[in-house]
Amino acid sequence: LTKAQKIAGCVLANIGAETISIATFENNIPISLEIMPIGSTDITNDIALGLKISLDEAEQIKMGAITSYVYPKKKLEEIIDARLSDIFELIEAHLKKIGRNELLPAGIIITGGGSNISAIEESAKTSLKIPSKIGEISFGGIIHPELKNSVYTVAYGLCIFGFSQENDESLGVKITSITKNNIINWFKQFLP
């Protein structure tokens, strides 16, 4: 997140496989944290059940991969839209609970593996009635395109947190620029 987003007010939603973690910011301060027991695996399961296909095929279809399986596109859209609607209803309920629904000028920033689902950005915007965007990793320098994928945002965020705590002896974290390069090289080994 940018400082401007956190000052204006935004919600960061990390959509993982099993859970969704959200952090709401205003005036550069996190005002609410919530973890919800729903994730992108639920969408995969819905696709598998709805189209009567294997979980592997459902996952590939969910992520937009071209498969040999022929399926009705309209039915797939309905399945995905229904579960995304459930997800954003939960987020909306939380924002109502804290009095911030439709009141976050910087909107929702979506990260995590679930952020790669097609139409998620538009679904969030329509459901929450706030701006919506997919979070992007920015290293301030050259970074391999695969590492910009929002799947890596949590790992990336933890690394940045470690870097920012470099001089904090109470956490016992000492990260040098050599370690920073080692982390980048470690990420690169997972790239195709």
Where are these regions (language model features)?
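Helical "lid/coupling" subdomains associated with nucleotide-phosphate turnover
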Residues: 1-15, 21-192
